[in-house]
């Protein structure tokens, strides 16, 4: 009888449980290699605007398809559908912008700028509660240390903005002799002409529902 009990006990012992390795061992190395692109600024150099251009109130025409490369980060279908119309509005605001109260110079926007800006807007909006619809966008043009406000866009008036994006655009550096008289206070003969924007730009992101530091992305 004891022999049978010992045999039964030996059969009933469960196999040992093997502990799995911590998942952090698999992605820890990847996280360590990710470069931090965030920094903080005490305040923005851009002046506040007295008026705003709303996406929902503008009469937008059919916008030609803009090719935006696929990315794992662009996982917001609603934002991807909204982005082409938003870029159309941004293009319209920039071409109609009054750079100076004395004269109006038309800004030329390269296609590469709009394409890159579309990618960046989706990238910065993908983790937000309302996605791109919750964005408040300030368009500015940099001139040396000065920052000139162009327009402010509320993407969706029906949504309370959850984050603010300040887009800092730059004029083409090859046009510097023509740029010098653009922002002057005195009229310069022949200066009211078209100027081309550079494909490069900088975006400052500020979350409106938290006290986190500003995030700066430069393209």
Swiss-Prot record:
InterPro entries: RTP801-like, RTP801-like_C_sf. GO terms for molecular function: 14-3-3 protein binding. Its main location: cytoplasm. GO terms for biological process: apoptotic process; negative regulation of TOR signaling; response to hypoxia. The keyword Cytoplasm applies. One of its GO terms (cellular component) is cytoplasm. It is found in: Cytoplasm; Mitochondrion. The keyword Metal-binding does not apply. Keywords: Apoptosis, Cytoplasm, Mitochondrion. Regulates cell growth, proliferation and survival via inhibition of the activity of the mammalian target of rapamycin complex 1 (mTORC1). Inhibition of mTORC1 is mediated by a pathway that involves ddit4/redd1, akt1, the tsc1-tsc2 complex and the GTPase rheb. Plays an important role in responses to cellular energy levels and cellular stress, including responses to hypoxia and DNA damage, via its effect on mTORC1 activity. Plays a role in neuronal differentiation, neuron migration during embryonic brain development and in neuronal cell death. Belongs to the DDIT4 family. PANTHER family: DNA DAMAGE-INDUCIBLE TRANSCRIPT 4 PROTEIN, DNA-DAMAGE-INDUCIBLE TRANSCRIPT 4 PROTEIN DDIT4. This is DNA damage-inducible transcript 4 protein. It comes from Xenopus laevis.
